[in-house]
Amino acid sequence: MRAIAHVSIAAMLLMGSSGRGSAQTPTDFFKGRTVDLYIGYSVGGGYDVYARMIARHMGRHIPGNPTIIPKNMEGAGSIRLANWLYNVAPRDGTAFGTVSRGAPFDPLLGSPATQFDGREFTWIGSANNEVSVCVAWHTTGVARFEDLLSKELVVGGSSAASDTDQFAKLLNALFGTKLKVATGYPGGNEINLAIERGEVGGRCGWSWSSVVATHKHWLEQNRIAVLIQTALSKHADLPDVPLATDLARSEEQRQIIWLIFARQVMGRPFMAPPGVPPERAIVLRDAFMSTMKDPQFLADAEKAKLEITPVSGADIEKLVKEVYRTPKETAAKAAAMIR
């Protein structure tokens, strides 16, 4: 792994402004171009659905109206894409992506697969502030969180870097649940198919917005039980489902829970590589937030049952830096729990 300089995103943006073509106006630069939107998961999952919806509308809000092309680059729970964006992708504003909300924090947690510093990405925004859940299939005999203390539930996972794996392992370490992770599925869509086939009995780290958007019929037909919410606060739809944060028994547990679940604030994050010229970074940020208020986008999102509670790129940048200030001892304990 090459050495990663701890440079602020502001400095990286200033460095990028000296590059070729910085004298162009954003309209001149983006006119007639295509912008690639990379998705760190397979087709059909929650990250993919959100990204493709945004790709259909965001180009209208970028000066010059470029065409945005969604492309999937799944692998290693989206760490493959995060590494590529950081080290390989063009830094001129023509490439950005969406990765697991937890991926930017993996270097802090000691993941050997990461080749980036989450603080240095050009953060564009998030489509929502997310709540995730653990669910169990109706035939497993697991109907509530307390059942997990005495009965093993096999849950599907994407990789050691994904919420699907990390949240289940954290619950085991903190509360003594008996969640067994069967990992290696390319994305959430494949995990859901595995649940239907009986390969696994449920999943953790499943975004509630994705549950409602893609599998609301499972809820309506009582085919799954929602066991626990893994976030910093409850979702309004789930007042009677326990929140992991409320189960903490010590200040140390609360600190670890905050470290791992703070990512939920940036539920569907979008970022460009470090070093994007500052005027283009501003354009992408503004275009993203304008898209989040676009009546056509919101109408399409409502039809698709996508929850839209946007978070600005500036707020994400602030959050990521705050999480990276976690004491090393706390981060090390959290890392041991989720590996």
Regions inferred by a protein language model and the residue ranges of each:
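Extracytoplasmic "Venus flytrap"
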Residues: D36-Y50, E74-G77, G156-D163
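Hinge/capping helix and adjacent helix->loop/strand transition within the periplasmic-binding protein
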Residues: V35, R60-N65, W84-A95, A103-G198, ...
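An extracytoplasmic/periplasmic, membrane-proximal ligand-sensing/linker region
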Residues: K31-R33, E220-N222, L247, V265, ...
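Sec/Tat signal peptide C-region and signal peptidase I cleavage site
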Residues: G19-A23
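Short beta-strand->loop
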Residues: R119-A127, K178-G184, T214-R263, S312, ...
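Bacterial N-terminal signal peptides
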Residues: H6-S17
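A ligand-binding cleft/hinge motif common to bilobed small-molecule-binding domains
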Residues: R101-A113, D165, K169-L174, G202-L247
